[in-house]
């Protein structure tokens, strides 16, 4: 066991972790859930908080890495899902709920004329890239350093999220023949994109981009950068894919497309849309989407695609994401992130804080964080002191400098104020 000391009673979590390692790799089912000396095990959650098996209560800004926008154990979602459970969980046949949710997505998201449901963000990005390659008959794709588009071979190169946190941004087991078609570019760098396209004329199928890089912290696009990507892809007949698995339905009703006023050809969504259940989707222009089988020849399929449980939860979630939701969650994130920056400044701690609507993160870094190379030079040891300090004070964030924090509709002013008190205590302790 690691010698990191957390000043909380975590005896039951410790025992469960010891047992879990006998059956689960490092005791977890996703790398981002592990932290030293061991993660706490959750017993229950409600609204804005988690409760672990030892009875410790945490204000939650991880929110299951984004999906829990309406708070944990939302009664409307739970009741709707319970009712659907009485009628079946999977049919292998279409349901009306697939149409209902698709129509809601199309109503909200500017690029969405048609939808294909899948089961995760990973499936969505993999299928979107396959679609772009099939349509253009080109193999090469451009992705950005530090961007995480899921755990599939096309894009698991210089990835952010858990891959970067645990020191493996390039995963073994992926053939060079696969990744040789993946061209890396620094985010927010126009010249690099111009040069790559010039050197690979008529060979690039698509550019895939997180409009806000939420898997290497929270890095917003520079002014007009997304507009630049839209223009240069149109000029060169390259398909532009927005990976909106994080930003979709979170930062605006229509995601980053609406927020920044830039419409891609295709987009991928997930997380929030499932209301806590597994889900993903590829959305885009009809002329592109109709190339998926069975209408076209580009194959995409899944036993649980459009399953009625996820459709039910998705419908209930999106109907509650109104103007009040966006103004409230953005306001609470701004209040908290402003305080984080002011408090770090007061204690002479080098930092940069970035906020986009209800997404935010602090980097312990003196330099403006505009891309992966700068982000990975942040003081990760200091970040973990910040993480452990918050945990000891009843606040949970993702245990990585390279993840994002989120607010939900349940993070009221009182909750934010309590969090601010905890942050003040943590920064005092860090600088002692």
Swiss-Prot record:
Q: Which GO terms describe its molecular function?
A: glutamate-1-semialdehyde 2,1-aminomutase activity; pyridoxal phosphate binding; transaminase activity
Is Isomerase given among the entry's keywords?
yes
Kindly state which reaction or reactions the protein catalyses. Answer: (S)-4-amino-5-oxopentanoate = 5-aminolevulinate
* Pathway annotation from the record: Porphyrin-containing compound metabolism; protoporphyrin-IX biosynthesis; 5-aminolevulinate from L-glutamyl-tRNA(Glu): step 2/2
Q: Which residues carry this modification: N6-(pyridoxal phosphate)lysine?
A: 271
- Which biological process annotations from GO are given for this protein? protoporphyrinogen IX biosynthetic process
Which superkingdom does the taxonomy of this entry point to?
Archaea
NCBIfam families associated with the record: hemL, PRK00062.1
Q: Report what the protein is called.
A: Glutamate-1-semialdehyde 2,1-aminomutase
Organism taxonomic ancestry: Archaea, Methanobacteriati, Methanobacteriota, Methanomada group, Methanococci
The protein's gene is named hemL
